[in-house]
Amino acid sequence: MPQVHRNGDSRLCGATTNALAHMNVYVNSQPISVDGDTNSHGGGSLGARCKNVFVGGKLVVLNGNPAGRDTLCPIPPHCGPDASSGSPDVFIGL
């Protein structure tokens, strides 16, 4: 099962996720990441692929979920800065 992605978790490009929209749901003391969260390089909106867990009406992001390009694209891998880490002990089945 995939790990739940959170605020501050890494992206493939070396950025971290900015997941501050839902400050009332935490995983390991970090705000949970939801569909559309951006990264620390600017842009890079995450596309949640979890099909059945919502926070504030948005799907939860999991480790490995894809992202749109960030502001440093076309430098690789900024054109697809996918989620690349998550909680060590909180998982969601697909």
Q: Each predicted region: which residue ranges?
A:
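Intrinsically disordered, low-complexity proline/glycine-rich segments
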Residues: P2-L94
